[in-house]
Design a protein with these regions (language model features):
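ABC-type ATPase nucleotide-binding domains, specifically the catalytic core motifs of the NBD
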Residues: 106-119, 128-129
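Conserved signature/switch motifs of ABC ATPase nucleotide-binding domains
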Residues: 113, 137, 157-158, 190
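Catalytic Walker B motif of ABC-type/P-loop ATPase nucleotide-binding domains
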Residues: 163-166
Length: 218
């Protein structure tokens, strides 16, 4: 996997009933690069992220994580790539409310990482997102904005090559939104590529470039 092409897509198309949601879509992201996906609600930004992450299959085209064709490999290989290469920050947080904050962070344990290293990463990640010292709190007792910060901290612990973030600052208060942005920037500075679907002008300005979905790709 080269720095010049951590994740790429070629000729992607996705149909919603008889309508093409998008078609002929190409993109490439490299190390430390941020790509913002823009477009109106319903344009298919979230669907595109799921296709790029191997969660959903596009109707046309290919997605490569490095040199691996993500949708034409055995499920076990795709799971390994999602564990070690791709990180996700989705709108629903994907937080287990009954678990502690720390347990939610440790659920993503990359291959070869010891428990001691995982714990150290978790402490550092919580400091970055402004939740230092709260690892023993039950995640379900946190506010929605704080839970989104935990989701970002979890990706900081994982340290993936590519981060896929779906409206990570939507409906957050100013403090939580800024902490989420800070966490995403820490990921970029550590070497991750970031693809973020967003309406947040701050995130669009932060990105190296943007791609308008639902305009030139139909």
């Amino acid at each position: 996997m080269t720095d010049h092409q951590l994740l790429s897509a070629s000729g992607l198309g996705y149909d919603l009933g008889t309508r093409a949601l998008w078609n002929g879509l190409d993109l490439v992201v490299a190390r430390r690069e941020v790509l913002a996906l823009r477009g109106p609600s319903g344009a298919g930004k979230s669907t595109l992220l799921r296709c790029l992450g191997g969660i959903e299959r596009p109707h046309r085209g290919v997605v490569h994580a490095g040199d691996v064709d993500l949708h034409h490999v055995p499920a076990r290989v795709r799971r390994r790539i999602r564990r070690d290469v791709l990180g996700f920050v989705m709108q629903d947080h994907a937080i287990v409310p009954e678990w502690t904050v720390g347990a939610n962070l440790r659920v993503v344990r990359p291959a070869g990482v010891t428990r001691a290293t995982l714990d150290a990463r978790a402490r550092d990640a919580l400091l970055v997102v402004g939740l230092g010292g709260r690892s023993r709190e039950r995640a379900g007792q946190l506010s929605g904005g704080e839970q989104q910060r935990v989701a970002v901290a979890r990706v900081l612990v994982q340290r993936p090559r590519v981060v896929l973030a779906d409206e990570p600052t939507a409906s957050l208060d100013d403090v939580s939104a800024e902490r989420v942005r800070r966490g995403l920037d820490a990921l970029r500075r550590s070497g991750s590529a970031v693809i973020v679907a967003t309406h947040d002008p701050g995130l669009v300005e932060w990105a190296d470039r943007s791609l308008e979905i639902g305009v030139e790709h139909v």
